[in-house]
Amino acid sequence: MNIALLGFGVVGSGVYEWCRSREDLHVRRVLIRSDKPEIASIATRDFEEILHDNAIDVVAEVMGGLHPAYEYVTAALKAGKHVVTANKALIAAYYQELTALARQ
């Protein structure tokens, strides 16, 4: 399964390491704000690269906060991607909208 991570802070880097330990998961892209030499070959600052990459099965939002997480998650769902998040603020604010998008 090909995964894109949105964020590479404490949570994102931990999810990245966990995915690397699994043979069935492949982190294809990581959306970053600042340079991360350890993931330079898969890092991007352009969310559109993730959105339009048909090989990406799942987008994992690990950035936290409401914005731009909301915009990224809704765009990914509208593009037909599966989305995983543990962002409590995002879910609390937009639960009904996000679940409706996910069901489409």
Located regions from the model:
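Gly/Ala-rich phosphate-binding loop of Rossmann-like dinucleotide-binding domains
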Residues: 16, 20, 77
